[in-house]
UniProtKB/Swiss-Prot annotation:
Taxonomic lineage from the root: Bacteria, Bacillati, Bacillota, Bacilli, Bacillales
UniProt keyword list: ATP-binding, Cadmium, Cadmium resistance, Cell membrane, Ion transport, Magnesium, Membrane, Metal-binding, Nucleotide-binding, Phosphoprotein, Plasmid, Translocase, Transmembrane, Transmembrane helix, Transport, Transposable element
Topology in the lipid bilayer: Multi-pass membrane protein
Residues noted as binding Cd(2+) in the record, renumbered to the chain: 14, 17
Catalytic activity, EC: 7.2.2.21
GO MF annotation, one: P-type cadmium transporter activity
Matching InterPro entries: ATPase_P-typ_cyto_dom_N, ATPase_P-typ_P_site, ATPase_P-typ_TM_dom_sf, ATPase_P-typ_transduc_dom_A_sf, Cation_Transport_ATPase_IB, HAD-like_sf, HAD_sf, Heavy-metal-associated_CS
Protein name: Probable cadmium-transporting ATPase
TM helices/strands, residue ranges: 89-109, 111-131, 151-171, 317-337, 347-367, 669-689
Known function: Couples the hydrolysis of ATP with the export of cadmium.
Active site: 398 (4-aspartylphosphate intermediate)
A GO biological process held by the record: response to cadmium ion
Intracellular or extracellular location(s): Cell membrane
Length: 711
């Protein structure tokens, strides 16, 4: 099987250049396939080719080729050290000749030999690379933007319009420079991610601490991270305690506490204590590396709108050449029109018909939006998903770990006996001590509740511990037998004490979606404790915001009983609640939603909800930073455990769709208006190039507005 090699490409400025570069690389002997990712500025080469050969294939655009791994660990490769003058000397010199040419025209007239000579120099100096490419394409009958411009400039020279020909050259060069700048600006959001993680780390080996480059750090090495330093590699804490700012990866604004065995990510900032971290991944496998790789792949994916534009442009450019030829020849041949006038009009049509603005309208918006999402802790796997999210009508949520925190907590503790606070505390300690010996999934909530209130659970010695299957637990403390269990257990033990008042309290807790347990002896009830999977504080706001953004229906799907589901669903404000569902039921429900609403998203944890996530139009996984599975399988991953990023993603996607539509519409309308100027004979080369350049500038600036989108 042929080997695949990925290179980063510096200097890739336009989609036409990318297509030509791809064709050139495919022609290299030994290469079986080449795919350029214009958004990410990368090329994947299948087969045998040296860097020098690939670079030679891009010599027409002075492209610089860097191996992907080398460029990743050293973003300095992408820093252009050339001065502005050195980079743009042809453009500047051409502009100077044009300025002097117009001065000569004012003083000596437009037919003066020096005036025309200055404009000719301006055309050849400023249009050298344009002509070189245009003539090659013309000989191959490839009708690109360069071909259109070359024909237009030759025609202008042929009818003696040297001044306007020179203006076409310089304004086209300015237009290309603006396109290059806008794409670089859009890509910068991803390149900035490369700078997040340090290139070196303090590593302890054989008892000695030394600075080691990330390429040389191995799995199992111990990194020493001081307060205020960034973490260079993914790993887990083996010593120390601190708060780590994970905003760069997850978008979380509040630092996250880190203790022994907690995971940390490359590119995050250690804010407080000294940490010793065992490295768990190589530099190319860190979470930030995966994010960069997947985002760049996403930027290379063609969105439906982009596919439409590319197909349209393929037929549009030859059509413009035919229309221009007809305008130039039909009026003089059939209606006795002036040849010079109509040839000039035809040349103007060639220039105004250049599809620069149309071609760049979609990629600049997609690349910018995906980059903005990544910087805010949202990984979108491609332009197609960005467009799909923008058209969502319904969103389904898994309950556990999505709308709720996924961790049981004690929500209520009700004492049923009159006693001092000291006795109340002792009662709770006895109950928690019993739960320490239990395997019940809710036991951890009772223990943690006691620990957070600094209760000494080790002070109690439990004897004769027994589990009562399906009902609760029993144990002896200081000669007294205590029980913790369900209401059913205590109805059997203490039927006479299970009063209407206690029954009401238990029922009220259960109606709120909580699990009620009782604590007591075989002689008296002591307390009621309620445990629940705590609803995220942000869930209600998120659901409300989604409805404001135009999501018609929000649905909570859960395997919990209907009473618990209703309690939590009503609390967060979803429009529909479905309980007691198996994974297959969730899958069937998503399929039905798609029939009813068309485009549907499913939000879950990326593992348990895999079938439903896969069936949805867009599968959105929570907490992607903690699981490779979520990053790799979901269409969209919310990197932090933060549901509030969902409304931001919907808003960004809808704004992206809006801007793409604006760009395509504006690009076509501005050209149509300019073409209509042919009828009264008002279209000039000046107007044509200004319409083309102006449209390109406006659509790129409009696309770059997506950098500023926030929720």
């Amino acid at each position: 099987m042929a080997e695949k090699t990925v290179y980063r490409v510096d200097g890739l400025s336009c989609t036409n250049c990318a297509a030509k570069f791809e064709r050139n690389v495919k022609e290299i002997e030994g290469v079986t396939e080449a795919i350029v990712n214009f958004g990410a500025s990368k090329i994947t080469v299948t087969g045998e080719a040296s860097i020098q050969q690939v670079e030679q294939a891009g010599a027409f655009e002075h492209l610089k080729i860097i191996p992907e791994k080398e460029s990743f660990t050293d973003p300095e490769h992408f820093t252009d050290h050339q001065s502005f003058i050195r980079k743009n000397w042809r453009l500047l010199l051409s502009g100077l000749f044009i300025a002097v040419g117009y001065a000569s025209q004012i003083m000596n007239g437009e037919d003066f030999y020096l005036t025309n000579a200055l404009f000719i120099f301006a055309i050849f100096i400023g249009g050298y690379s344009l002509f070189k490419e245009g003539f090659k394409n013309l000989l191959k009958f490839e009708f690109t933007m360069e071909t259109l411009m070359t024909i237009a400039i030759i025609g202008a020279a042929f009818i003696g319009e040297w001044a306007e020909g020179s203006i076409v050259v310089i304004l086209f060069a300015v237009s290309e420079a603006l396109e290059r700048y806008s794409m670089d600006k859009a890509r910068q959001s991803i390149r900035s991610l490369m700078d997040i993680a340090p290139k070196e780390a303090l590593v302890r080996r054989s008892g000695t601490d030394r600075m080691v480059h990330v390429d040389d750090i191995q799995i199992g090495d111990i990194m020493i991270i001081k307060p205020g330093q960034k973490i260079a590699m993914d790993g887990h804490v083996v010593k120390g305690y601190s708060a780590v700012n994970q905003a760069a990866i997850t978008g979380e604004s509040i630092p996250v506490e880190k203790n022994i065995d907690d995971s940390v990510f490359a590119g995050t900032l250690n804010e407080e204590g000294l940490l010793e971290v065992a490295v768990t991944k190589r530099v190319e496998d860190t979470t930030i590396s995966k994010i960069i790789h997947l985002v760049e792949e996403a930027q290379g994916e063609r969105a439906p709108a982009q596919a439409f534009v590319d197909t349209f442009a393929k037929y549009y450019t030859p059509a413009i050449i035919v229309i221009a030829a007809l305008i130039a020849t039909v009026p003089p041949l059939l209606f006795g029109g002036n040849w010079e006038t109509w040839v000039y009009q035809g040349l103007s049509v060639l220039v105004v018909g250049c599809p620069c603005a149309l071609v760049v309208s979609t990629p600049v918006a997609i690349v910018t939006a995906i980059g903005n999402a990544a910087k805010n802790g949202v990984l979108v796997k491609g332009g197609v998903y960005l467009e799909e999210i923008g058209g969502l009508k319904a969103i389904a949520f898994d309950k556990t770990g999505t709308l709720t925190k996924g961790v049981p907590v004690v929500t209520d503790y009700i004492e049923l006996t009159e006693a001092t606070n000291i006795q109340h505390n002792k009662n709770y300690i006895i109950m928690a001590a019993l739960e320490q010996l239990s395997q019940h999934p809710l036991a951890s909530a009772i223990i943690k509740y006691g620990e957070t209130r600094e209760m000494d659970l080790t002070s109690i010695n439990v004897n004769d511990f027994t589990s009562i299957t399906g009902k609760g637990i029993r144990g002896t403390v200081d000669g007294n037998t205590y029980y913790v269990g369900s209401p059913v257990l205590f109805k059997e033990l203490l039927a006479s004490q299970f009063t209407d008042s206690i029954h009401r309290q238990v029922s009220d807790l259960q109606l709120k979606g909580k699990t009620a347990m009782l604590f007591g002896t075989n002689q008296k009830l002591i307390s009621i404790v309620a445990v629940a999977d705590e609803v995220r504080s942000s869930s209600q706001h998120v659901i409300k915001r989604l409805h404001e953004l135009g999501i018609e229906k929000t649905i909570m799907l859960t395997g919990d009983n209907q009473a618990t589901a209703q309690a939590i669903g009503q609390q967060v404000g979803v429009s529909e609640i479905e309980g007691e569902l198996m994974p297959q039921d969730k899958l069937d429900y998503i399929k039905q939603l798609k029939i009813n609403f068309g485009k549907v998203a499913m939000v879950g944890d990326g593992i348990n909800d895999a079938p439903a996530l896969a069936a949805a139009t867009v599968g959105i996984a929570m907490g992607g930073a903690g699981t490779d599975t979520a990053i790799e399988t979901a269409d969209v991953a919310l990197m932090g455990d933060d549901l509030q990023k969902l409304p931001f993603t919907v808003k960004l996607s809808r704004k992206t769709l809006q801007i793409i539509k604006q760009n395509i519409t504006f690009s076509l309308v501005i050209k149509l208006i300019a073409l209509l100027l042919v009828i009264p004979g008002w279209l000039t080369l000046w107007i044509a190039i200004m319409a083309d350049m102006g449209a390109t500038l406006l659509v790129t600036l409009n696309g770059l507005r997506l950098m500023k989108v926030k929720d």
